[in-house]
């Protein structure tokens, strides 16, 4: 089954896709956040376009494993997607942005400065972690 991943931030949503059974993911860019309904419509289009059976959405947790303040901004999007029939699985996204920054460390400066590229790569890291666990 094809699986997508979302790294949901304040301004952008990083996108990635992969295949269950294969621990590699590919970035698919990012969406600039608008209203909740516009975000949901854009993500439904992403799900259809990529032929996804499931979305893995990063859940921002604190180091003590409790939901962070940002989680309260992610959950309404998750519930809206579920209400539209999308299978969504929440996944611990702690350190995904740090790992994405590490991957970008030796990239050209224009890529390192592109915050959207960082969001996309964070979604890739998130999905690769999910796929590597074979769930």
Swiss-Prot record:
Cell location: Cytoplasm
Q: Set out the biological process GO terms recorded for this chain's protein.
A: rRNA 5'-end processing
First and last residue of the signal peptide: none
Keyword set includes Cytoplasm: yes
**Keyword annotations:** Cytoplasm, Hydrolase, Nuclease, Ribosome biogenesis
Entry's Pfam families?
RuvX
What is the top-level taxon of the source organism? Bacteria
SUPFAM superfamilies assigned to the protein according to its UniProt record, in alphabetical order: Ribonuclease H-like (SSF53098)
Gene3D superfamilies assigned: YqgF/RNase H-like domain (3.30.420.140)
Q: Which InterPro entries match?
A: RNaseH-like_sf, YqgF, YqgF/RNaseH-like_dom, YqgF/RNaseH-like_dom_sf
A single Gene Ontology MF term assigned here is: nuclease activity
Gene Ontology CC annotations of this record: cytosol
- Enzyme Commission number(s): 3.1.-.-
Top-level enzyme category: hydrolase
Family under the similarity heading: Belongs to the YqgF nuclease family.
This molecule's function is given as: Could be a nuclease involved in processing of the 5'-end of pre-16S rRNA.
**Record-given protein name:** Putative pre-16S rRNA nuclease
Name its species: Thermus thermophilus (strain ATCC 27634 / DSM 579 / HB8)
| Species lineage | Bacteria, Thermotogati, Deinococcota, Deinococci, Thermales
């Amino acid at each position: 089954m094809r699986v997508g991943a979302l790294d949901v931030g304040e301004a952008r949503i990083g996108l990635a896709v992969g295949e269950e059974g294969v621990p590699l993911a590919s970035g698919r860019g990012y969406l600039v956040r608008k209203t909740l309904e516009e975000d949901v419509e854009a993500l439904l289009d992403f799900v259809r376009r990529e032929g996804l059976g499931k979305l893995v959405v990063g859940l921002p947790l604190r180091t003590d494993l409790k939901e962070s303040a940002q989680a309260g901004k992610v959950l309404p999007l998750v519930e809206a997607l579920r209400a539209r029939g999308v299978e969504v699985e929440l996944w611990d996204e702690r350190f995904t942005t740090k790992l994405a920054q590490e991957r970008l460390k030796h990239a050209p400066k224009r890529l390192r400065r592109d915050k959207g590229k960082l969001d996309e790569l964070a979604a890739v890291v998130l999905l690769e972690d999910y796929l590597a666990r074979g769930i």
